[in-house]
Regions:
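Amphipathic terminal alpha-helices
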Residues: 143-161
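Amphipathic alpha-helical segments that line or abut small-molecule/effector binding pockets
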Residues: 62-70, 144, 148
């Protein structure tokens, strides 16, 4: 958090005519991500534990790219939050992934304390896209709608690779 913020401040000092775009919980077609990991692990294990006390905004990489392009066509520089619309927990996100993928898997909620990771994560990292809405005049897709399209495309391609 702090090092990212310091980097943003430095960039804005050096180049005031810049866009700082913040996103969260990003997933896309290239490389690994939470969606592919949950899908694969759910299919292999049949049971998963996922934290339900961390909240955020799942964000489709194509949606992010589209909105960054729209921003770049303006000269309204500044800091923008650019995330999928709506807030959920990692548990909610995982349940929706498993449901859409049609994977026979039980997803159980757990707390952050029960699922330690090397990096400490904030309990609430959801962002509000108000500045983006005011600037480009539209909203990022609702996270469930974007996820449904993504999962459908992955299914047609043979599932997560």
């Amino acid at each position: 958090g702090k090092s990212k913020w310091l980097g943003e401040q430095y960039v804005r000092e050096v180049c005031p005519r810049t866009f700082v775009v913040r996103t969260a919980w990003l997933y896309g077609y290239v490389g690994g991500n939470f969606v592919k990991t949950i899908w694969k692990n759910g299919a292999q294990k049949g049971e998963l534990k996922v934290v339900d006390d961390q909240m955020g905004n799942p964000t489709n990489a194509n949606d992010l790219a589209y909105h960054i392009l729209k921003l770049a066509l303006t000269d309204i520089y500044g800091v923008y939050h650019c995330t999928g619309t709506g807030v959920c927990s990692w548990y909610d996100f995982a349940c929706e992934i498993i449901r859409l993928a049609g994977v026979p898997c039980r997803v159980a909620p757990c707390t952050t304390d029960e699922y330690p990771t090397p990096a400490k994560r904030p309990a609430y990292s959801a962002l509000d896209n108000a500045m983006l809405r005011c600037t480009v005049g539209d909203e990022m897709r609702e996270w469930k709608a974007a996820l449904a399209v993504y999962v459908e495309k992955l299914k047609k391609a043979g599932g997560p690779q």
